[in-house]
Regions:
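Mature catalytic core of soluble alpha/beta enzymes
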Residues: 3-254
Length: 254
């Protein structure tokens, strides 16, 4: 049975090993779109947008997927002492990486919006599955963790409904694999790690992963612009509201 690839919204699913591959891919994307509709930052009807527009002190109901993502995000925020923080959204809004001639925001605007950043401004109610902000102006953005969650849930769907298949799910830096690669004796899948600032498809390293494993890569080269000979990238430091200065151009986690 041959394989098929489908690309939607920068998400790629390649699958094979079963006759109804199109149904497999379509079903996996349905799982993704359901999650996306809830965690979208831009869809006014999403769970995230409803929370973002809610006033302080008023609990906002979370759907099961959004609750799980927020719960895990807060765990990571605490473990990293705030280096990862989903409340970075008010500062993110100041940074424009899409315009033809982007410029960094004024420092006074960053400072003004930093007062809304801090995961301690969130109260997650595990019993009622609600999220409450303690001050007005707090917003969350699940873009830093939602993609990986959606990728994992899509893989679980494939595993449950098409156990004899194989699949590669590439969701913009989040790569999960399932099953046995028919082109490899050991069944592994080879994933290339993009060379920072090089042409797309130029890899710094090739890594083999097996069924159920994943590799996630993020880097300063993915969304960035130069201004006055300085590189400004999209990975913001919640403590400063400016691009992080870790010294790394790319980090991958297996």
């Amino acid at each position: 049975v041959g394989s098929e690839m489908c690309i939607r919204d920068r998400c790629t699913i390649t699958a094979g090993g079963v006759k109804n591959t199109k149904e497999l891919i379509s079903g996996a994307f349905d799982v993704v779109y359901k999650i996306q509709s809830n965690i979208s930052y831009y869809d006014s009807g999403s769970t995230v947008s409803i929370f973002n527009s809610s006033p302080a002190g008023v609990p906002a109901a979370l759907d099961p997927d959004t609750y799980t993502i927020v719960e895990k995000a807060l765990e990571v925020s605490k473990a990293s002492n705030g280096a990862f923080d989903i409340t970075i959204a008010p500062v993110e809004e100041l940074w424009d990486f899409k315009s033809e001639s982007p410029v960094p925001p004024e420092q006074n605007l960053i400072n003004e919006n930093l007062k809304y950043v801090g995961y301690n401004n969130l109260i997650l109610d595990s019993e009622n599955k609600t999220l409450t902000k303690t001050i007005d102006g707090v917003k969350i953005d699940l873009g830093g963790c939602g993609k990986g969650y959606a990728c994992q849930k899509a893989l679980e769907y494939i595993e449950e409904n098409y156990p004899d298949s194989y699949a590669i799910l590439d969701f913009g830096g989040n790569v999960n694999v399932y099953g046995q690669n028919p082109k490899k004796i050991n069944g592994s899948f080879t994933v290339g790690i993009q060379e920072p600032f090089a042409a797309n498809g130029s890899y710094s390293e090739m890594v083999d992963i097996t069924s159920g494993e994943s590799i996630v890569t993020s880097g300063t080269y993915q969304r960035h612009f130069y201004y006055n000979n300085k590189n400004y990238h999209h990975i913001l430091d919640p403590s400063t509201g400016t691009p992080s200065d870790s010294g790394f151009d790319s980090v991958s986690v297996i």
